[in-house]
Amino acid sequence: MMTGTLGTLVPIILMFAVLYFLLIRPQQKQQKAVRQMQEELKKGDSVVTIGGLHGTVDSIDESKVVIKTGDNTRLTFDRRAIREVSAAE
């Protein structure tokens, strides 16, 4: 009787393990990389926001970033709104 129960649980456990390694773990790694990138922002970095705005970091505090665009307009965003960073130019 115990063998039958164990035999039905093994495939379910294997499915959860595969699901974890194919879906959940890569997403966690990506979120960690994005979080690290946002924490390492510095003045002068060229950035792209999640809305597609391109600009240069003008100033930073703990939760907000001021971005200067091509026409010297300054816009304030949450740090979480930064999608990509390229090195300071």
Curated annotation (Swiss-Prot):
Record flagged with keyword Cell membrane: yes
Compartments reported by the entry: Cell membrane
- InterPro entries membership: Preprotein_translocase_YajC
Q: Which UniProt keywords apply?
A: Cell membrane, Membrane, Protein transport, Translocation, Transmembrane, Transmembrane helix, Transport
Bilayer topology reads: Single-pass membrane protein
Which parts of the chain span the membrane according to its record?
A: 4-24
Q: Where does the UniProt entry say this protein principally localizes?
A: membrane
Please give the biological process terms from Gene Ontology that the record holds.
Answer: protein transport
Taken from the record, one Pfam family name reads YajC
Query: Oligomeric state and partners?
Result: Part of the SecDF-YidC-YajC translocase complex. The SecDF-YidC-YajC translocase forms a supercomplex with SecYEG, called the holo-translocon (HTL).
Output the PANTHER family linked to this UniProt entry. Answer: SEC TRANSLOCON ACCESSORY COMPLEX SUBUNIT YAJC
What does the protein in this record do? The SecYEG-SecDF-YajC-YidC holo-translocon (HTL) protein secretase/insertase is a supercomplex required for protein secretion, insertion of proteins into membranes, and assembly of membrane protein complexes. While the SecYEG complex is essential for assembly of a number of proteins and complexes, the SecDF-YajC-YidC subcomplex facilitates these functions.
- Could you say which protein family the record assigns here? Belongs to the YajC family.
What protein name is recorded for this chain? Answer: Sec translocon accessory complex subunit YrbF
Q: Which organism is this entry from?
A: Bacillus subtilis (strain 168)
Q: What is the phylogenetic placement of the source species in the record? A: Bacteria, Bacillati, Bacillota, Bacilli, Bacillales
| Gene name of the encoded protein | yrbF
